[in-house]
Amino acid sequence: EANVWYLERLHLGKHRIDESKSLISISFMEVKEIQNREILQAYMKYELGITGQAVSTIVRRFVCIRNFIELLGQEKILAIHATVAEVKKYADGLRERGIQAKGFNERIFGIGHFYKFMEVKQYITRMPFRIEYFQQKEVIVHHDRSVEETVYMEILKKLYLFPERLRCMFLHLWCLGLRASEVCTLKGNAYYQQGEDYWIQVYQVKMKNYKRIPIPQALYQIMKVYLKK
């Protein structure tokens, strides 16, 4: 079994891949113990082949699991022999690092998901710990990421100094309120005219669907000129 999996060779559906992210491969080389590595590879075959989740979600969970297995390896412990004590030690390490509740829970749930897989596949007879025992209470915080008017007006004044590609990207962010990741994955055929209205079609990775957004005529004309070059 290869210890590095290249995503382009896995023939995954395009709707599962966020093209704005630079993820190229998945590495198992960090897991030195052979049995631990083989079980982790079996788990990733299930995740990538069966679940249909976004690759970025799967890989984020994979990294948490791999980090935990690496810690087990340092103690010469097989993943199938891990107990609640090892999970507690891992959780204590997260707290010492100041990991917030959301990130903490994501890591613990990821490890729990891995052990539930092992239970179903009969690598182990039962889960060695209860996720609920470690789960932290999450306090939802609203992050105001809006840009002050003085800032974006200053950018607009100096926009002519930027390369054309960056000018176009900024206009999409400013005019349409798109996410940066959405702007980075726009295709040339995303722009079209319908009657007297102008539209852009944007793919949403999380929703696994396209959304249509009305755009100013000026932006449509700018992009038509840019795309002809």
Region spans (language model):
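Non-catalytic DNA-binding core/recognition domains of DNA-processing enzymes
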Residues: 1-24, 50-122
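Flexible interdomain linker/hinge and immediately adjacent N-terminus
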Residues: 22-26, 89, 97, 124-155, ...
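Hydrophobic (often cysteine-bearing) scaffold residues that line and stabilize catalytic clefts
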Residues: 61, 107, 165-166, 215
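Alpha-helix N-cap/helix-start motif at helix boundaries, enriched for small hydrophobics
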Residues: 111, 169-170, 181-186
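Proline-centered turn/helix-capping motifs that create local helix->coil transitions or kinks
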Residues: 119-128, 192, 228-229
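Basic, Lys/Arg- and aromatic-enriched nucleic-acid-binding interface segment
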Residues: 153-180
